[in-house]
Amino acid sequence: MKHYVLVHGGCHGAWCWYKVKPMLEHSGHRVTVFDLTAHGVNMSRVEDIQTLEDFAKPLLEVLESFGSDDKVVLVAHSLGGIPAALAADMFPSKISVAVFVTSFMPDTTNPPSYVFEKFLGSITEEERMDFELGSYGTDDHPLKTAFLGPNYLKNMYLLSPIEDYELAKMLMRVTPAITSNLTGTKSLTAQGYGSISRVYIVCGEDKGIRVDFQRWMIENSPVKEVMEIKDADHMPMFSKPHELCDRLLKIADKYP
């Protein structure tokens, strides 16, 4: 039996794994899902998030609660890749493999914010649509928020069932934009995050994080293996849940 820990993306929550969780459990595995700070039904506000550690706190608490011999398959989607990478840096001995599903994936050279800030710089005004950036924090420590409006969200859910898109519209929450002011300027370590096995799952019809940007992140920080779900949009847990579970089961078998 493997133990999967599933990390949701920005503005979403543990709810987005509702199709994948029972499939993995039906295959005989243990699955842990949770809400990141100020997401899903977590009662914190985005203003409570002053550091990347604050954002990742529920994930860090989950990993901390496991025994020293417990190893998990850490699966991160979209913006969840950055708090997941921090968790892997802090608890490398508890990670058998980290799986980045069309996800922001830091390196060990730049600050963890580097890939997200690079992404923001790569999208045009036309592509940005109603992807809204806001601000909070103080003059000394300015921070940014991000929110996925219904038009940008629709692009992310392009091949997903309409019901899942409607559900997402109802459940969206403001997320912290992962800037260097949030993460600090230090990179994740080669001894921690850099020492774990990583696999990247490319989603071939993703209009949220384009395929060329997914491929750039893989070039920027090479992984053990790259898999692809050709007909998946940005939300493979909705558009291609069976294919996603198939990849996750194969990965868990390969990286004990």
Curated annotation (Swiss-Prot):
GO terms for molecular function: hydrolase activity, acting on ester bonds; methyl indole-3-acetate esterase activity; methyl jasmonate esterase activity; methyl salicylate esterase activity. Its EC number is 3.1.1.-. The active site is at S78 (acyl-ester intermediate), D206 (charge relay system), H234 (charge relay system). One of its GO terms (biological process) is defense response to fungus. InterPro entries: AB_hydrolase_1, AB_hydrolase_fold, MES/HNL. The keyword Hydrolase applies. It comes from the Eukaryota. Belongs to the AB hydrolase superfamily. Methylesterase family. Methylesterase shown to have carboxylesterase activity, methyl indole-3-acetic acid (MeIAA) esterase activity, methyl salicylate (MeSA) esterase activity and methyl jasmonate (MeJA) esterase activity in vitro. Required to convert methyl salicylate (MeSA) to salicylic acid (SA) as part of the signal transduction pathways that activate systemic acquired resistance in systemic tissue. MeSA is believed to be an inactive form that needs to be demethylated to exert a biological effect. This is Methylesterase 9.
